[in-house]
A protein has these predicted regions:
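PLD/PLD-like phosphodiesterase catalytic module centered on the HKD motif
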Residues: 1-16, 22-145
């Protein structure tokens, strides 16, 4: 199953998931087992998911089930977009606690699993710097007048 690398990256003590990609087109976000695993994980106290993308419209078109599911979890899922409209090289990843999965080739699902403390810390610092240059995007609901 394509979602196994994603769901297996969630160690028990992890309270924060960070997903970064241009549009998540190659990610298995619409798979029911993944959505159920994320829902079960989000039900635990203090859990949140941050999603950073350049094109949330493409994400919603590619993954309509995820887009609908996300509305119910809008209080726990934060969607962000870089203000300069660019992703730094090498920050196409999923970070979950002490593990980072870095995408090398999405069509073939070649990933690099990083558990080395120094390397994970370095990537997390890069992510923290990058997140400071992001703004909220893709609201869970749209208020109409």
């Amino acid at each position: 199953m394509a979602a196994d690398p994603v769901t297996s990256a969630q160690p028990a003590p992890t309270t924060d998931l960070l997903l970064i990609d241009r549009d998540f087109a190659a990610w298995p976000l619409d798979e029911s087992p993944l959505l159920q695993a994320l829902a079960d994980w989000l039900r635990l106290p203090g859990r949140r998911v941050r999603i950073v993308a350049l094109d949330f419209d493409a994400l919603a078109r590619s993954h309509p089930r995820f887009a609908r599911w996300r509305r119910d979890w809008g209080h726990r899922i934060e969607a962000l977009c870089p203000v300069d409209g660019a992703l730094p090289p090498g920050l196409r990843l999923l970070a979950a606690g002490p593990v980072v999965l870095q995408w090398l080739d999405a069509p073939d699902w070649r990933l690099r699993r990083i558990t080395d403390v120094v390397h994970v810390r370095s990537l997390r610092e890069q992510c923290a710097d990058f997140l400071q240059r992001c703004e909220p995007a893709w609201p869970a609901t749209t208020l109409g007048l």
